[in-house]
């Protein structure tokens, strides 16, 4: 077990700051929701619609940028430090292009928003919010590229410090622009977009300055010279990153589809489902951080041409994710009523939500396993097949089963519980498939590297 404990330490060392960063991003969104909600119902609704659109698009594009981590991680393990700097400069062109494209989409989102059957008092806030935040997503894309570069070399603490500072700065900026403090215009929910853009710019500049002056990055010479866009690097990023982005989109679309299917059952069901999903998402940050850490750790070891240790790291990731998931499940089951009570005091919503978070507790195990496997597979630069397996698991199994059980069941419709049954079945199928894929990739890499560099007799 000593070899696994060593990898546990490595994953925890890399993963804890990543967890802190993810928590900071989540709290930033929660701050926007709380402050906009106190400005008025329309402001909250407008912000909710705006973030629903922007987050879905952003998570797809951020998946593409996540390709930077395994690319850098493998080069770092191979000690090709100057090539890391060269790759970063070339990938920044890709990130800038994606960021500008996103900004263009959000700035012109009114074409789609105005077609929705939503009150104009809400859509006007949504449109103005998306315009305000549009250039901010460009800054976030550049920040994410630099973040993944840093994390690929195991330097995760600086990203956490900057993300945490950004979260703290977002609070006063929200108050200033939402409520019109200190002579600023009172913008309501739109003010959250202004605050997000300012914070994103400061975070981007902060990480750029830190990387420029910290001795940790000097050996890669990230900004020592100018590099033109590279077609080969662009293809590499898109080949690796597009499946990651599509995989994230497939997963998000399953949750969105579940909400749409349940929407016909009334506001109590929708509200209860939203509470349960939100709780599951918060606990999901633990395996997410471990999975992202594994992408770095496994990538480093593959770069070192050490497939045996990479296999141990990947196995340790799964073990750590299972342990974390079981702890999460115990917490959810033990304190379920209390946690739900923090979200709502309405008795019908509370009662149904309490029953649903029992499913959220079961949800943790397959969700944790799949996140650990996905993270490890990214470290091996294996992203296309996992995306196909994800599509099959969620849209061939989870959604049809969930829809049938919700509306028909076995004699009686199961309602929201049926949808959760379907999602758990789909997740369980994918967790098994992803483990099988990981085992195959690990064995293939051991064979390939042993042929390339046979052990001395």
What do the predicted segments below correspond to?
Residues 1-15, 72-138, 184-242, 298-363, ...:
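Short alpha-helical transmembrane segments in multi-pass integral membrane proteins
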Residues 27-45, 113-120, 176-187, 249-276, ...:
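Helix-terminus/linker motif at the lipid-water interface of multi-pass membrane proteins
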Residues 3-34, 38-39, 55-67, 71, ...:
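N-terminal transmembrane alpha-helices
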Residues 18, 22, 33-34, 51, ...:
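Transmembrane alpha-helix boundary and packing residues in multipass membrane permease domains
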Residues 44-103, 107, 140-154, 158-159, ...:
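Small-residue-rich hydrophobic transmembrane alpha-helices
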Residues 65, 133-151, 159-167, 192-208, ...:
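Short runs within selected transmembrane alpha-helices of multi-pass transporters and secretion channels
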Residues 13-32, 132, 136, 166, ...:
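Transmembrane helical elements of multi-pass membrane transporters/channels
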């Amino acid at each position: 077990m000593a070899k696994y404990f060593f990898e546990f330490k490595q994953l925890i060392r890399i993963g804890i700051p990543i967890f802190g960063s993810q928590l900071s991003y989540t709290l930033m969104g929660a701050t926007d929701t709380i402050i906009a909600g106190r400005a008025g119902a329309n402001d909250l609704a407008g912000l909710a619609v705006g973030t629903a659109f922007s987050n879905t698009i952003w998570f797809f594009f951020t998946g593409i940028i996540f390709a930077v981590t395994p690319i850098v991680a493998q080069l770092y393990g191979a000690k090709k430090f100057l090539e890391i700097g060269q790759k970063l400069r070339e990938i920044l062109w890709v990130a800038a292009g994606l960021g500008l494209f996103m900004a263009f989409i959000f700035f012109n989102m009114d074409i789609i928003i105005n077609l929705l059957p939503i009150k104009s008092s809400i859509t006007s806030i949504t449109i103005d919010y998306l315009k305000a935040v549009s250039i901010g997503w460009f800054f976030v894309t550049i920040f994410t590229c630099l973040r993944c570069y840093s994390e690929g070399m195991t330097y995760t603490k600086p990203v956490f410090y900057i993300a945490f500072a950004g979260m703290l700065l977002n609070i006063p900026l929200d108050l200033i622009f939402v409520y019109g403090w200190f002579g600023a215009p009172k913008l309501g929910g739109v003010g959250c977009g202004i605050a997000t853009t300012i914070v994103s710019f400061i975070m981007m500049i902060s990480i750029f300055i830190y990387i420029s002056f910290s001795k940790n990055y000097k050996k890669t010479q990230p900004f020592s010279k100018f590099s033109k866009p590279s077609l080969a690097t662009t293809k590499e990023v898109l080949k690796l990153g597009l499946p990651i982005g599509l995989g994230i989109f497939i997963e998000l679309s399953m949750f969105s589809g579940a909400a749409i299917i349940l929407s016909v059952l009334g506001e109590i069901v929708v509200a209860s489902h939203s509470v349960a999903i939100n709780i599951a998402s918060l606990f999901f940050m633990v395996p997410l951080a471990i999975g992202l850490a594994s992408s770095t750790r496994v990538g480093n070891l593959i770069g070192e041409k050490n497939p045996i240790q990479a296999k141990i790291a990947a196995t340790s990731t799964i073990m750590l994710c299972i342990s974390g998931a079981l702890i999460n499940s115990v917490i959810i089951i033990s304190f379920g009523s209390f946690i739900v009570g923090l979200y709502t005091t309405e008795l019908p919503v509370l009662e149904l939500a309490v029953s649903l978070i029992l499913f959220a507790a079961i949800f943790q195990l397959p969700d944790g396993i799949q996140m650990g496997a996905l993270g490890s597979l990214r470290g091996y630069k294996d992203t296309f097949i996992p995306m196909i397996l994800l599509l099959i698991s969620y849209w061939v199994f989870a959604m049809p089963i969930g829809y049938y059980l919700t509306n028909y069941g076995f004699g009686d419709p199961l309602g929201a519980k049926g949808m959760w049954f379907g999602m758990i079945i789909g997740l369980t199928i994918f967790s098994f498939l992803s483990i099988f894929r990981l085992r195959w990739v690990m064995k293939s890499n051991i064979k390939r590297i042993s042929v390339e560099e046979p052990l001395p007799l």
